[in-house]
């Protein structure tokens, strides 16, 4: 009995210990604070576009678009072609310039019906005397970031043949057409005044006209050839055929140093031309005769005719290193011998090849009341009378 009781007590004790072990709370470890997770995003920058390569002469091609007509034997009886200028590359500049060239080509194509009409109306061109409607292109400048092209258009359909010239000029940095006044290192007033003087001289030399209209002194277009401004004209403007006239303005500034200009002035006798606008819309061509000696003396005569001057003057001159020509003169009126006066004239000298331009630098002490920026075009006598 006692043994059974001991076993029962032992069993109860074991059960009690087991129950305690199940109800004792588990020891919990404090949580270690976790650092907030950070997401790092790598920023990948877009690669910068490569700068556009400058357009050079090697990037410019002339592609002849030929649709000449042939007879049954394969001989050409009507020359019909156009020289299309193409700038290579995918740049915006190339695209803009090519669009302008394409527009000029499409203008040529718009006249194709006229060619077909002449050929269908019984006109009989032959291989020995073919008709022609052609446009030839010459790339005349790619320097100083300026692209210039001279076009020569020829037309003959059995009657009178015509030749016309025109130019297209572009800024190679922007692809935009370049105005004549913006292409040269001179003020727009000086450029336009020099153009008038050049054309006035040309008209006088070819037509012996003292006066001309303002309208004739405006070129229809221009190009740059041998770094020089060239004025372009259609047929029947300054003659039956069109023409090109070089104007002594060049790209890039002075072509000669002051020392070279002094030598140039001293070795020639000069005849100069400039224009005076009249109230009636006409432009009178004025003439100046000039000579410069090595001893610093000079002589000047000016009026409307190179054979009959109104005023003559003698004195001294200086040409500074910054190309300013100063003339101190005693001037007499040819027709009023008692009329004389002293005058000081100053000009900025801009020299081209054989010609020079004398530019009025201020409105003070000006020759014949010329305004600032107006010009006198001077040419060696030997050149003028050759």
Summary of predicted features, one role per range:
Residues 16-19:
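C-terminal motif of bacterial Sec signal peptides marking the signal peptidase cleavage site
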Residues 283-326:
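N-terminal glycine/threonine-rich, aromatic-flanked beta-hairpin/loop signature
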Residues 324-386:
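Beta-sheet ligand-binding and adhesion/scaffold domains
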Residues 2-10, 14:
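Sec-dependent signal peptide recognition
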Residues 134-139, 166-169, 287-292, 312-318, ...:
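Hydrophobic/aromatic beta-strand elements that line small-molecule binding cavities or substrate pockets
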Residues 21-31, 36, 42-271, 311, ...:
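Compositionally biased intrinsically disordered regions enriched in Thr/Gly
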Residues 265-286, 315-317:
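Tryptophan-anchored aromatic micro-motifs
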């Amino acid at each position: 009995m006692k043994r059974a009781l001991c076993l029962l007590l032992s069993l109860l004790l074991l059960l009690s210990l087991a129950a305690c072990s199940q109800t004792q709370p588990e020891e919990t470890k404090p949580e270690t604070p976790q650092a907030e997770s950070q997401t790092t995003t790598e920023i990948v920058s877009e690669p910068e576009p490569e700068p556009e390569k400058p357009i050079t002469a090697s990037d410019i091609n002339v592609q002849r678009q030929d649709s000449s007509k042939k007879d049954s034997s394969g001989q050409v009886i009507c020359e019909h072609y156009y020289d299309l200028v193409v700038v290579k590359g995918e740049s915006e500049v190339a695209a803009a310039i090519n669009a302008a060239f394409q527009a000029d080509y499409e203008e040529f194509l718009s006249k194709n019906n006229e060619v077909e009409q002449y050929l269908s109306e019984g006109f009989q061109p032959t291989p020995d005397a073919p008709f022609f409607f052609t446009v030839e292109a010459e790339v005349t400048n790619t320097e100083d970031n300026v692209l210039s092209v001279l076009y020569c258009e020829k037309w003959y359909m059995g009657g009178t043949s015509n030749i016309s010239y025109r130019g297209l000029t572009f800024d190679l940095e922007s692809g935009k057409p370049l105005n004549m006044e913006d292409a040269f290192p001179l003020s727009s007033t000086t450029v336009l005044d020099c153009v008038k003087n050049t054309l006035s001289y040309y008209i006088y030399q070819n037509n012996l006209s003292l006066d001309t209209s303002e309208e004739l002194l405006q070129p229809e277009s221009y190009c740059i050839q041998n770094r020089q401004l060239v004025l372009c004209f259609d047929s029947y403007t300054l003659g039956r055929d069109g023409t090109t006239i070089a104007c002594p303005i060049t790209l890039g500034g002075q072509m000669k140093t002051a020392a070279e200009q002094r030598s140039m002035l001293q070795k020639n006798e000069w005849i100069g031309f400039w224009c005076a606008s009249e109230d009636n819309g006409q432009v009178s061509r004025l003439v100046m005769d000039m000579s410069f000696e090595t001893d610093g003396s000079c002589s000047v005569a000016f009026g409307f005719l190179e054979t009959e001057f109104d005023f003559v003057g003698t004195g001294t001159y200086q040409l500074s290193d910054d190309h300013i020509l100063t003339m101190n003169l005693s001037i007499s009126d040819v027709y009023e011998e008692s009329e004389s006066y002293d005058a000081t004239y100053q000009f900025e000298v801009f020299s081209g090849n054989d010609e020079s331009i004398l530019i009025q630098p201020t409105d003070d002490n000006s020759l014949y009341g010329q305004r600032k920026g107006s010009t006198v075009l001077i040419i060696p006598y030997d050149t003028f009378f050759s």
